UniProtKB/Swiss-Prot annotation:
Gene3D superfamilies reported in the protein's UniProt record: Nucleic acid-binding proteins
Keywords: Mitochondrion, Ribonucleoprotein, Ribosomal protein, RNA-binding, rRNA-binding, Transit peptide
Protein's UniProt name: Small ribosomal subunit protein uS17m
A GO biological process held by the record: translation
CDD domains from the UniProt entry: Ribosomal_uS17
Similarity annotation: Belongs to the universal ribosomal protein uS17 family.
Predominant location: mitochondrion
UniProt organism field: Homo sapiens
Length: 130
């Protein structure tokens, strides 16, 4: 019985920026789950890519989307930065769309003031109608 191993040539990759010291280049670490055929258990496999960041907008810790280039820009740079999915420290819950830190939602003081003002206005409208 032979095990067929396929290499992944992904055009789009999501990873975390681990370095930005090179000019217009971001060092991105991508983690994939790989099945061990003997143990039948998945293990993390990490790979590091270099991506062209023309505007130098990445910072260490950002979650980014990379696009494969048709022709490599350099010996190691074979991808370009397509989009910053999440900036470091500015995580937004995909279900509610609210900013969060860990398991708690962050509310700005302005949003809490506007909710209090809207409640006060609703009370005033109800009392004036009666």
């Amino acid at each position: 019985m032979s095990v067929v191993r396929s290499s992944v040539h992904a055009r789009w990759i999501v990873g975390k920026v681990i370095g930005t010291k090179m000019q217009k280049t971001a060092k991105v670490r991508v983690t994939r789950l790989v099945l061990d055929p003997y143990l039948l258990k998945y293990f993390n496999k990490r790979k590091t890519y270099f991506a062209h960041d023309a505007l130098q907008q990445c910072t260490v810790g950002d979650i980014v989307l990379l696009r494969a280039l048709p022709v490599p820009r350099a010996k190691h740079v074979k991808h370009e930065l397509a989009e910053i999915v999440f900036k470091v420290g500015k995580v937004i819950d995909p279900v509610t769309g609210k900013p969060c830190a860990g398991t708690t939602y962050l509310e700005s003081p302005l949003s809490s003031e506007t909710t209090q003002l809207s409640k006060n206005l609703e009370e005033l409208n109800i009392s004036s109608a009666q």
